Amino acid sequence: MTTLKAEKRDMQTKAKKLRREGFVTGNVFGREMKESMPIQIAKNDAERFFKTCTKGSKVTLEIEGQSIATLVKEIDYDSLKRQILEIDFQALVKGEKVHSVAEIVLLNHEKVNTGVVEKLLDEVSYRALPESLVEKIEVDVGDMKLGDSIKVKDLPIAADKDIDLLTDPETVVANVTAVHNTVEETAEEEAGETAQ
């Protein structure tokens, strides 16, 4: 599990001011916590963490000498400014199932030469105990052919008895569709209209 250093946040200081000072704000919450704990994380540490981790990742937060095993629940990201604004963490409790998501990563799509691989689902929603959490599902699509599709029920996570799948097993993850050459089709249509 990755470790991320954080500090308890003084709520007197506004989030905008903290961001200007190089921090990302966040909250830690959980069943065994009396109330959520506002935190701040150095912006550089948060950005480095999210180069390899994402929503659904497990992380140990080091907060003033205390280690808390958590799950990344939400990431508020400003895509225009390309910066992380806020992160919510759920404290994990041994023996308690938590709701999470696993990111779907397609592998070898460049090997498919009978069509184009179309990714239709980015993540799978599920419930599991902390020790059974899954961050990423890698799907090898290299052997797929035109007309083939992969559904959630075909993924390894669907066969895992320790995981309660929340996404519909019949949901299509990816399929291979025909390549349409729209420029040629448009030219042919225009030629047909002119001939009429």
Regions picked out by a protein language model, each given a short descriptive name:
Residues 1-196:
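Acidic, negatively charged sequence tracts
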